[in-house]
Every structure is written in C-alpha cells, then in structure tokens.
Amino acid sequence: MEKFEGYSEKHKSRQQYFVYPLLFQEYIYAFAHDYGLNDSEPVEIVSYNNKKFSSLLVKRLIIRMYQQNFGINSVNHPNQDRLLDYKIGFYSEFYSQILSEGFAIVVEIPFSLRELPCPKQKEIPKFQNLRSIHSIFPFLEDKFLHLDYLSHIEIPYPIHLEILVQLLQYRIQDVPSLHLLRFFLNYYSNWNSFITSMKSFFLFKKENKRLFRFLYNSYVSEYEFFLLFLRKQSSCLPLASSGTFLERIHFSRKMEHFGIMYPGFFRKTLWFFMDPLMHYARYQGKAIFASKGTLFFNKKWKWYLIHLWQYFFSFWTQPRRIHLNQLANSCFDFMGYLSSVPKSPLLVRNQMLENSFLIDTRMQKLDTIVPVTALIGYLSKAQFCTGSGHPISKPIWTDLSDWDILDRFGRICRNLFHYHSGSSKKQTLYRLKYILRLSCARTLARKHKSTVRTFMQRLGSAFLEEFFTEEELVFSLMFTKTTLFSFRGSHSERIWYFDIIRINDLVKPLN
C-alpha cells in the first residue's frame, strides 16, 4: 500500500486548472470549428442562417442552461421549446454543437499539460510506426503462440452519465465546469438512453463525437490505471506505454475501502499478474486478455475483474460479458479480423546417411481471416450487391461523372485491400473486389443505358487499372510482360501496413 501511495502521489497533479473562464473566449470555438473541418472524420457543421459566430450567444446559452425551468421545459415541450429558441436566436443546433466541441477542447487542456513529454524522451518520435493499428498484429503473432486461454471482454458501460462526470472529479477540480457539463448533458434527454447500448456508444452523433470520446476515454483510463499499477508492481518488465494512462486522485482511499469490503482479497489477487505471459489489448468497446495458465487461474481473474467494475466503479456488469475460451480451440473477432491459433500438421523429412525418417509435427500459427459474410452484408446494406453477394448497380451515383464513379469504387476497393492485407486467405478479398468491380460496371452501364459488355469493351484496360491494389501495382512493375492476375497465388503472404491509424469504415459496423 505504501508503494501504491507513492506511485499515486508521483503521478498526481496538485495544480488546479480553472478552465471555466475559457468557455467565454471566442478563439476556443474557432479551434472547435477548425477541428470539425480538418478532422480525418469530418463533422458536419450545422449552418445557422449564415450568421457569424458570437461568443455572446454562447454566454446566453450557458445562462439559459442554468435556469431552473430549463430541464422541465425541454422535457414537457421539446418541439415548442426548440422552435422558440430558434426564433429568438440564442439556441440552435449550431451553438449546441459548437459548445459541445468547445467544452471538449477546454476540458482536455489539463490532461494535455500533464502529458507534456519531458526532454529525456526525445527519441520516442522514431517509433511513430507503433501508432498504426496493424502494428499490434505482429506482436500477436509472436506472443499468442505460447499462451493457453483468451478472454474476450465487452467493456461495461455506465448506466447513467452522472457516473462519468463523477469520474472526472478526480482530475478536474474546477467545479463550475463540471456543473456546466451536467446541465449540458441533461439537455439531451435521449443521451441517457443513447448510452445504455454499447454498440450505440461508439456510433456517436457526429456533432458531439469529440465530447463523448473524451468522456469514454477518461473512464477507460481509470480502470486501466488500476491494471497498470498491478502490472508494474508484479513484473520486472518495464511498460513503455505507461505514460499513456492517466492517474486517479484519491485512488488510495478507494483501495482501502475495497480492502475493507473484501479483506485479504487484494493481497491474494496480486499473484494474478505475476506471470509475464499475460497480454491485454483494447479496441473500441472491447478488449482481449490472453494468458498462460490453468482454467481455474483464468476463471479467478474473470471474477476479479467483474468485482473490480461493480464495487470499484459502480458499473453493473455480468459474467456473460467476459467470454473465456481455450486459445487453441476458439476464434476471436479482433480489429476486423477473425483470428485463431490452430495447430497445423507439418511433415518433415529427416535424412541421416542411408536412413530417412518422416517426422510428423504440429505447429501453431496465428491465422487471420477476413469475415467475408459480414462484409458482404455491409456491401448489401450500402446497395453494392444483394444479400447473397450478387453485384447490382448503385443508382444514386449515376448523376456523377464517369471518372468520379470509377474513383469512388476504386478507392473503396483499394482501402479494403489495404486494411485487410494481413488476411491469411486472399481469395475472399478477390471476391469482394469482383463485387465492387462489377457493381461499378453496372452503374456506368445504367448511366449510359448500355450493356455491361459494351461498356467494358469501350473502356478497356483503363477500367481495370482503377481497381489495382498496391500489391498488384508492385508486381506489375516487377513483371511487365505477365498479367497481374497470374500472380494472385504468388503474393498470398500477409502484409501489415504501418500507416493505418484508424479502423476502416467498412469494419466499424462489424464490431
């Protein structure tokens, strides 16, 4: 406990950041507006009669949120209240969105100040490739072959947004900002029901995505801080990523309360993390925890994590949200891939002088497969094919120019191949490529009121070049006299690209 208190004091900041006055600075909302325009996932900014932004209107909005009858009016007469606000000019979707983005920017300031890199860590930028999503798969290929069990975890969600606000109190001691956050969240009466679904938690409303992402990340860093402390105290292996987790103020008090409720429980569970062969990875609202040991060992850890969420964070969770399976006999969904570690037979011939021996061995290998059925279902929902995978035209794009249509289909195909380049079976990707290519041809043929065969003959090789992937382009430069399609089986090896920093849009609905 003394070590923990020292660790907590080391990472705890005693400075109090008063961020509330920044909400009335106009440049903050200019940053929020620029973020919406320059973000990699664009946010649609709702226009407001082409009027210029004014911090005075934001101030009026904040004052109105503090009125006592604000919550009652918005619940009893939501449509009438919204229409009245729109007419008088100081409440609209535009200013609600700007206030949400502005508050998210302001409240992130204390955390960015705590995470400023020290001069000794100037070497870190050379490891920028580790930011890539694909960088984790070579790690899994190296480590998972020696593990026994895998737990697939669905991270529990708070039953009420007030819990997220209370978690922020340990880091932000600016009371007016927290009160404003409560009033702002209470306005959206549908947010409480909106947050009760883990799937919907990540399909944020576009105009409030940054604020929700901040609230969720602050919650996740809380329980990961607990796991980080146990890991650092029980293993001699240093963690290079320890700086990414944020501290929790007054954590030792909660630890003492936890020890009173479960005397001796904390001391007994320390050995859970003594084994260095334990690996944790989180993505979106899920996490995987792989370890080496017995079934009893992993079941105890499962119940330990459930008690941690229920009694430590007041988050209700159920045992079925943690699926424990033997790694060699299970398949898990991770980052858009269906991964498994099967044992493949390998026949090795060993010859010694005049005698020859055949040795039958079984080797383990991380197998990553593209969930083709789910991707075809998504393409069907996007009207590129039928539910059975039969390509169809996309009428909504027939108003575009021919090259715009080719560019859109080609970009989707290249992005799909780029993200799923690590697949063990590339045949499924070529099936998706066939669907997109024929759907593009039918869309162009429908636009020009001709047949697919006639249109393909008119475009010739220019049509096929739009669907070339990076691997095929490399092979076309190496072997210019050979057609690209003859190399389909020769470049079946998995390729991980280190320039992918976010999940493909086609993968998001699958998680």
Swiss-Prot record:
It comes from the Eukaryota. Its main location: plastid. One of its GO terms (cellular component) is chloroplast. The keyword RNA-binding applies. One of its GO terms (molecular function) is RNA binding. InterPro entries: Domain_X, Maturase_MatK, Maturase_MatK_N. It holds the Pfam family MatK_N. The keyword Transcription does not apply. Transmembrane segments: none annotated. It is found in: Plastid, Chloroplast. Keywords: Chloroplast, mRNA processing, Plastid, RNA-binding, tRNA processing. GO terms for biological process: mRNA processing; RNA splicing; tRNA processing. Usually encoded in the trnK tRNA gene intron. Probably assists in splicing its own and other chloroplast group II introns. Belongs to the intron maturase 2 family. MatK subfamily. This is Maturase K. It comes from Phleum pratense.
